[in-house]
Design a protein with these regions (language model features):
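Metal-ion/cofactor- or nucleotide/acyl-coenzyme-handling active-site neighborhoods
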Residues: 1-172
Length: 172
């Protein structure tokens, strides 16, 4: 929610692209996006990955949890994809938090390829990588149950839930 609030005008003006936007942003925050395809999203109410919910009918509802990859996987499954390739999912941030709510700072990490990418990053959500790992475990569980294979093609990174595949091999 925080990310879109800061750039709603820019997103609204985008031409020639589909914009999947949670309807809750319109309902609760009065953020309307031109030509949006709105979807209903519901939060998870558990910390146990095998109890995380996933939607097989995204026209009714999708479930979120800590990372947009969880939502994207539901869209891909609904569209019939049997393979999902994660690219650029570092799963490691300059500033993050753990499950105790403690802030963790790693000065060796640069979050974006340019300092201008998110100039308002200090006001954005601080990711909880422990919760995100649980989310990726749930994503793997649900994809496995649907015979969908998820590969991590990220160069480097800290995400080790999915089997690795070399990024360059995707281009051969």
């Amino acid at each position: 929610e925080k990310m879109l609030a800061g750039c709603a005008d820019i997103v609204s003006k985008l031409q020639g692209t589909e914009k999947f936007i949670p309807i809750q942003l319109k309902w609760w925050h009065d953020i309307a996006i031109n030509n949006a395809i709105y979807f209903n999203i519901a939060a998870q109410q558990t910390e146990e990955p095998r109890q995380f919910r996933v939607s097989d009918n995204i026209s009714q509802c999708m479930y979120n949890s800590s990372t947009c990859m969880y939502t994207a996987a539901q869209i891909a499954a609904y569209m019939g994809f049997q393979k999902i390739f994660l690219i650029g999912v570092d799963h490691h941030f300059h500033i993050s938090q753990n499950n105790r709510g403690e802030i963790v700072v790693d000065n060796s990490v640069k979050d974006y390829f340019t300092d201008k990418y998110n100039e308002d990053k200090d006001r954005l959500y601080i990711p909880n990588t422990e919760r995100s790992t649980l989310t990726y475990l749930a994503m793997k569980h649900h994809c496995d149950a649907r015979n969908i294979v998820v590969y991590n093609a990220t160069r480097g990174g800290k995400l080790e839930v999915f089997p690795r595949i070399g990024f360059d091999s995707l281009l051969e």
